[in-house]
């Protein structure tokens, strides 16, 4: 079973395909296998990699809460790339993985060919409410275990869209979630989810980001919609895709639309055709051209 040793923690990874590297970073309620619809599609064109975050078996589940943080999540992406002797890669993350992808780009821009940041922003509009909700879920992981808490989490307000559209796909998602580690999820939520900075607090750093970036969100993923628009406005090299009637797990809920949007983006980046936003498109008037 392939493992990358990152700061003494073993991270399980999977690979498929050849070509330019494309690494996938999973969400809180997923793991590397959550990217199978993308791995099967993109491995025809790219060297695809996906890994289980720390806390997600068969990756190690460190007991020390200090082993889990937002920066560590970004560093783990770098660690997997280092293990595979990959200098630069396209990086695609969802939710928790989207945050990690953004922070990877901010911390190690020289290692990123592009960033695909999907479903990122939860907690930014109401940080205190986010912390309260997280405490509820953490206590459930610690007292009720993975089966009951995972099922509870899978019925969240941005998950029910998937349940309605594709009950069989949603059940696969739910079954994969409840097979995880309650301890790992509790530690991850406490160390990463609860303590990460809001998207809005990253404004100054995002305005300096020159890595080509694609932001993807579902229009019914309420906690991520406004942060997605904010990122589009602040990252000068970014584009925004909003998928209609779609919740949080955009890569699973709408795999064809997600794959097509990401492929079009990667094709433009690889061809050198994804550029910064034109300054004259930022004129205050919606009609009058910017002064020359």
Regions found by a protein language model. Give the residues of each.
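Acidic beta-to-alpha connecting loop that harbors the catalytic carboxylate
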Residues: 18, 219-221, 245-247
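Active-site loop/oxyanion-hole signature of alpha/beta-hydrolase fold enzymes
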Residues: 40, 49-92, 96, 260-263
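Conserved HGGG/HGGXW glycine-rich cap/lid loop of the alpha/beta-hydrolase fold
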Residues: 7-66
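Conserved alpha/beta-hydrolase catalytic His-Asp/Glu region
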Residues: 126-132, 143-205
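Conserved alpha/beta-hydrolase "acid-adjacent" motif
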Residues: 222-227
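Short beta-strand/loop motif that positions the catalytic acidic residue
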Residues: 209, 215-217
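Catalytic active-site module of serine/aspartate enzymes centered on a nucleophile-bearing elbow/loop
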Residues: 238-292
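Flexible "cap/lid" loop of the alpha/beta hydrolase fold
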Residues: 102, 106-107, 112-145
